[in-house]
Each structure stands twice: as structure tokens, then as C-alpha cells.
Amino acid sequence: MKFYKYQGAGNDFLIADNRDGSVQLTTAQIAALCDRRYGVGADGLMLLESSQEYDFRMVYYNSDGSGGMMCGNGGRCIVAFAADMGLNHFDFEAADGFHTAQIIAQEGMAKTVRLKMKDVEGYEHHSSLTGPNCASDGYFLDTGTRHYVRFVPGLDAYDIVTEGRDIRYNAEELQPVGAYVNFIEPYEGGIRVRTYEKGVEDETFACGTGIVASCIASYVNGVRPSQAFEDGRIGYDVKAKRDSLAVDFIPTDEIVAQDVWLTGPATYVAQILVEID
């Protein structure tokens, strides 16, 4: 079976072209392929499938084989993959609905992709959470994936894996399915974000839907945007573990964030042939 490996801001994925429907993988097989010690290794696996309404369908799985959610970095990577497969338009369906994208720059194997995300209609502010080791102030939002966002000082030294795992598993307000947990520290000109990812159960180099959630929570919390435009749109520059991304949206009275766009890198890494048991 042929896979292609792509990474978006260090968030890496195995992708297969399944427009003919021939790729059928079990949860255990996906987890085995994504295992970094005994498999190929990736944060997630995606299938590019045919769609009756749009140019293609994105099917996303976490590294543990769970699915049913949107992945922002994965969305940019599957657009880059679709372009490499010869597609010229990028209207597609995902677990959370319709998306569109544009490739706005390319240098070598790296593309810069601008991806339209879902509108975010509301949020929940929790002054504290109920559960062991979960007494933390933060915001819950759904950006295609469930996210909890915390503002913390000293982000570089912060133990986000321990606290992220506690919140993901123990916070009663987020159960029964839990949530990704994001930690933010504003800086002059933007925000820095680190994310504990549910399904990976560890920190990843970046999380696209988490970065979107973090930018919207920053707006709600009064963090000054990096840019403000005449049409009312605002933008935030974001630093992940190593790469920089950008989010822009229109805040409105009716919903929190409308016409949301995530811009960042998507890079081809390798082609891989795998025998599946």
C-alpha cells in the first residue's frame, strides 16, 4: 500500500489516495502505522476520497485510530497532497462540514495553504473545572474539534503534558469525550501556543484547530490582535513549537468568529510503500 508523508508545522501525517475506495484499514492497523517505534510514525492518518458534491473528501484519523473530527494542519496537508495528485480546486468535505482552500505560495516541496475553517458560534468560560488536578481558568470552544484553552505564564517551561492529560481525562465539564488542551502565552505582536492532543495523548509540534481556538479565545480575553482590517476582520500571528502560522476572522455580535481562515505551511516529506497484515 502506498502512503505519502506530509507535515504541517511539524504535525505529520500519512496520506493515501483512496478515490477508488480500495484502502480499508482497521483502527488497529491505523494505530500500528502511526506508531513511532514499531510503525512508520505519524500524528495522524488521512484518506483522500471521492465526493459527490465537492472536489474531494478528507477522512482523518488520530494516531490511536480514532476519528470523526477535523484537523487544521491535516486539512492544509491534504490540500497540498491533492495538488500534487493533479487537482486544481480545493473545495472539500470533512467531518465538520465544508471547507475550501487556496495555495498562496510554494517553494520546493513546501506550500503555504490558506484554509477556510468553520464558523465558531459560541464558547464557554470556566473559572474552574471539576476533577482531580483540574482547577484551571479557561475557555471551551469547538472549531471542528473540541478544545479547551488556558492562558499561562512561562509557556516554555510549563508542564503541558501533565496538566493537559489531567484536564482531558478528569475535567467533568469536558466529559465523556474530553478535549484537546491548549496553552497560550501572548507576546508583543501575537500569541504562542502549545497543545496536548487527544488521540495522540501527547504534545504535538502544532495543532491547527487548536491554534484557531486559541486565537478566538485570545480575542474574547482581550488580547490585542496582530492586525485589524477595514472590513472588521482581525488577525493573529501565532508561534507554534517551531513554525509560524496566522489566523484571521470577523468577530460579530451574532457569533464569536465568522469567515475563519488558517494559514500555514504544508510540506511533502516522503513516499512510503507498506505491507499491511
Q: Where on the chain are the PLM-derived regions?
A:
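A glycine-rich beta-to-alpha transition motif near the start of alpha/beta enzyme domains, typified by
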Residues: M1-A110, V149-D277
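Glycine-rich beta-alpha junction loops
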Residues: D119-E121, T143-H147, A266-Y268
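Internal active-site segments that recognize and position negatively charged phosphoryl groups
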Residues: T130-P132, S136-Y158
